[in-house]
Design a protein with these regions (language model features):
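Amphipathic alpha-helical interface elements
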Residues: 1-303
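Mature, structured domains enriched in cysteine- and short glycine motifs
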Residues: 302-352
């Protein structure tokens, strides 16, 4: 079959195409600026599907859909993607430190000792770069650098402990290395990362939970790093844990579920807070999207818009730090409006 040609289109031509497809554009100049900034493919092609139908073999927008609505969904996902990246970097640092502690406590702090082949399990790997020989070569190769902190430890102590070496290694390499730990070390690491008694998960099941979680986190980290659509992503990596709640979760809610099981809660809290903020922002402007996003994200969306008020003031603020207010009082937006308070002109605007 002959491939369809891809044609270049100017911003003006992109605008005309969107209008022909029925998308409502209230501010042409604003729409042009956003397309120039983010790109048609990133903004429109990646986020139009919930808002389009096929009519007479043509893709058209459903009645009433605006450019700003598509843009808002894009912004939701962009901010969610950034939050995923931040949370995964935080988790990465924690996991590397925990893994290094397990290795150092068992095999010492000298790489000549802790990077011995016999200390790990040589599993057959589909990808050669994640085999034990390849990973050990990569770890040993990272020792040969003139960059700190590895160079500093090599020169001053003649050895680089694992908690320093792991800093310079990709998270995916570390996770695949953990997968090659001996069962005793894997369990010790899992018990460091989880409260096994509170979860009532022990032994091999706890190790499987840890490994599955780490591989799912790698997938989301890589997705976020390469600008992939995040809010409706379905992981290729699978969770083997058998429990009733696991049967009901998928996609982004699964990531939150797994992060919430860890002892270290900051990655979960940061990501959950970002999701709630973005859903509140988007759904307060486009409540018709609540059902769709609730189903995709597998969450119960309850609109909540907090605002802040200074004592003896008749204005409410979306930004609690606006105008240097001290000891702000938090209210629901609806309550502030019922009390006759007025929005601050500085911080109360459409928060794209």
């Amino acid at each position: 079959m002959k491939n369809e040609r891809i044609f270049y289109a100017t911003i003006d031509e992109q605008i005309e195409k969107l209008k022909r497809q029925g998308l409502i554009i209230d501010d042409i100049d604003f729409a042009k600026a956003q397309l120039e900034l983010y790109g048609y493919s990133n903004l429109i092609k990646s986020y139009r599907d919930p808002y389009t139908i096929i009519s007479e073999d043509q893709k058209v927008y459903r009645s009433g859909i605006t450019f700003n609505q598509v843009l808002s969904l894009y912004i939701l996902d962009k901010n969610l993607r950034n939050a995923v990246m931040a949370s995964m970097l935080d988790l990465e640092e924690h996991v590397k430190e925990a893994a290094a502690d397990i290795i150092a406590s068992k095999y010492g702090t000298n790489p000549n000792d802790y990077l011995q082949f016999r200390n790990y399990v040589n599993k057959k790997k589909r990808k050669q770069r994640f085999s034990l020989p390849a990973i050990l070569d990569k770890l040993k190769g990272a020792l040969n650098t003139d960059k700190d902190p590895i160079a500093h430890y090599s020169q001053k102590y003649g050895a680089v402990p694992p908690w320093i070496l792991f800093k310079s290694i990709y998270f995916s390499t570390i996770v695949n290395f953990i997968n090659l730990f001996k069962p005793e070390e894997q369990l010790a690491l899992a018990e460091k990362l989880y409260d096994a008694d509170a979860l009532n998960i022990h032994g091999n099941s706890l190790v499987s939970l840890m490994l599955d979680t780490l591989f799912i986190c790698i997938e989301y980290r890589n997705l976020a790093a390469h600008g992939g659509r995040t809010y409706n992503h379905e992981c290729k990596s699978r969770l083997r844990l058998s429990m009733e709640s696991n049967n009901r979760i998928h996609g982004f809610s699964q990531l939150l579920f797994l992060l919430n099981m860890l002892k270290y809660q900051l990655p979960f809290k940061h990501l959950s807070k970002s999701l709630n903020h973005q859903l509140n922002r988007h759904c307060s402007m486009y409540p018709e999207d609540i059902t769709y996003l609730g189903q995709i994200l597998n969450v119960n969306i309850v609109q909540r818009t907090p605002v802040w008020v200074a004592s003896k003031s008749n204005r409410y603020h979306m930004d609690r730090h606006c105008c240097g207010i001290k000891n702000p009082i938090e209210l629901e937006l609806a309550d502030a409006q019922k009390q006759g308070l007025h929005p601050c002109k500085k911080c109360c605007h459409e928060d794209f």
